């Protein structure tokens, strides 16, 4: 049995001269055949992969800093790492700070909803992400759209294996995943299975109770 550790840094955080707790944790961990460790810098540290120009990369970088743009890419990257490395009986640990904490939560939610795709199904990751992020409201009931949870159940049994995270260590979760229009008006988007994390064996969340933010 191995440990697979996922470390997701916060908004604007990457390796520097004043590193976050996520980088320090990554640095402190042993990396061996029995423990595989992954680190991803936070949103807003680089432009979108699909941005073709320097201006586009700069613009998407600022969107990441302000509004969390790039969060989905970070979730998909961590998920892809798990696909390549996970073996039955491995224990999965996820850590994250700020929007990286929400990335960690969302990864746990994606695993609960869609399972972990078997190797060779990398092309299905965008579909799984799209299904996971799809916002359901009363519009769907009116149009007779099948529930994404109904679709996900069949998708999971067809393409995936179960992968239940053992531990989630979080600092100051910040969620910012946008808005969508429903019959009742504009509603804040959310991703399923990210609130209570009942699918994770152990959850620890450290919160700065006295922190002051401008928004």
Enumerate the language-model features and the residues they cover.
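Alpha-helical segment proximal to the catalytic Tyr-Lys
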Residues: 1-215
């Amino acid at each position: 049995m191995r440990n697979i550790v996922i470390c997701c840094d916060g908004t604007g955080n990457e390796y520097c001269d004043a590193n976050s707790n996520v980088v320090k944790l990554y640095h402190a961990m042993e990396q061996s055949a029995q423990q595989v460790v992954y680190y991803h810098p936070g949103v807003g540290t680089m432009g979108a992969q699909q941005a073709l120009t320097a201006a586009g990369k700069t613009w998407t970088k600022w969107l990441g800093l302000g509004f969390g743009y790039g969060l989905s890419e970070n979730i998909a990257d961590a998920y892809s790492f798990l696909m390549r490395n996970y073996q039955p009986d491995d224990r999965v640990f996820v850590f994250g700070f700020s929007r990286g904490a929400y990335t960690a939560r969302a990864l746990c939610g994606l695993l609960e909803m869609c399972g972990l795709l078997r190797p060779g199904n990398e092309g299905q990751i965008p579909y799984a992400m799209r299904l996971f992020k799809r916002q359901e409201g009363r519009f769907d009931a009116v149009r007779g759209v099948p529930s994404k949870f109904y679709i996900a159940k069949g998708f999971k049994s067809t393409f995936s294996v179960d992968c239940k995270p053992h531990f989630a260590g979080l600092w100051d979760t910040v969620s910012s995943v946008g808005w969508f229009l429903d019959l009742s008006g504009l509603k804040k988007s959310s991703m399923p299975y990210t609130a209570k994390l009942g699918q994770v064996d152990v959850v620890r969340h450290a919160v700065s109770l006295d922190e002051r933010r401008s928004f």
